[in-house]
Design a protein with these regions (language model features):
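SAM-dependent Rossmann-like transferase core, predominantly class I methyltransferases
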Residues: 54, 58-105, 117-118
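Catalytic cores of large soluble enzymes that bind and process phosphate-bearing ligands
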Residues: 47, 78, 82, 134
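N-terminal auxiliary segments of SAM/dcSAM-dependent transferases
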Residues: 1-76
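Residue-identity detector for glycine
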Residues: 4, 40, 82, 110-112, ...
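Conserved SAM/SAH cofactor-binding pocket of Class I
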Residues: 93-140
């Protein structure tokens, strides 16, 4: 992506600024939402939930090879970099505890409709997840 260091886990794909034009190639609907900030740098309106949804689709495709991701309207849209950060720190804890069991099996209670932790954990670390939620809209 672009230069500009963020303070995320060193293994994170999200330690640099987004290349929005490149991401918009993966999700063309995102392109019409690209704007310039006062410094003339491409960005998006992060307060617009539809734009964040489109950005997430682009990030999941670009970094995690996920070709399809959908979310019911009115559901929370997780910020992917922060969720990936959490997964990387979980991996550090497992490594520090010298967990040798393979494969790693994780129970995600309250996974939500996005399934974001299972998506990132299985993509980056090849972990297995059982994801549960009590909200029928999240499960459908």
């Amino acid at each position: 992506m672009k230069t500009g260091t963020l303070k995320l886990h060193p293994n994170s794909y999200h330690n640099t600024s987004y290349d929005f034009k490149s991401l918009a190639k993966n999700v063309p609907e995102l392109e019409k939402h690209l704007i310039k900030n006062p410094a003339g740098i491409d960005t998006v309106d992060f307060s617009n939930s539809n734009v964040v949804y489109l950005l997430n689709k682009a990030l999941l495709l670009h970094f995690y090879n996920l070709n399809f991701w959908d979310l019911p309207k009115n559901n929370l849209i997780p910020p992917i970099p922060g969720r990936a950060d959490y997964i990387h720190y979980m991996a550090d804890l497992l490594k520090a505890d010298k967990i040798k069991t393979k494969p790693i099996n994780i129970l995600d209670i309250g996974t939500g409709a996005s399934l974001i932790y299972p998506i990132i954990g299985s993509s980056v670390y090849d972990w297995n997840f059982v994801a549960v939620d009590i909200d029928s809209k999240s499960i459908d």
